[in-house]
UniProtKB/Swiss-Prot annotation:
Its main location: membrane. One of its GO terms (biological process) is regulation of sodium ion transport. It comes from Homo sapiens. The chain crosses the membrane at residues 35-55, 62-82, 151-171. The gene is NKAIN4. This is Sodium/potassium-transporting ATPase subunit beta-1-interacting protein 4.
Amino acid sequence: MGSCSGRCALVVLCAFQLVAALERQVFDFLGYQWAPILANFVHIIIVILGLFGTIQYRLRYVMVYTLWAAVWVTWNVFIICFYLEVGGLLKDSELLTFSLSRHRSWWRERWPGCLHEEVPAVGLGAPHGQALVSGAGCALEPSYVEALHSCLQILIALLGFVCGCQVVSVFTEEEDSFDFIGGFDPFPLYHVNEKPSSLLSKQVYLPA
């Protein structure tokens, strides 16, 4: 019962996490945020592996997903610090775009209710560096929107880490119990096949 509930919870969580990651990937593509795009791509692949491992009882896949959940929390903490300019980080820097674009964030450039101003790019040969659109006077700061997205990702990743640890523990116990009763052990089969041959040899050498 515990195995089923833990697996079902992790399957539902992975499915929701996959939807949230795809939504975030779309907006990062629209904002040309190349570092988050790469991170989201890796995240989506590992979430799919975790989902597959949970359904198919693949312990290693679930372990990889669980370890990645901790890494994903760290990455999203960095994103929060970046957009809130904590620890000397600047949200106007080109750290997330690899200096390939002057765009900063789709939410910053297209957030409803903001006043936008197009700034021409100077000395940039990148195809996506034609203009930088900055927002001002927003009801909700776009940086907070990015931070809230990361907070949601952290919450899901923490739940995934807990559920992943539980599923790994259950899978490990099931493997240990299976090995204890002789699973994948050819030794008992050898003894079963050995007894008829020994009995047959005894019958052959019995005196008439």
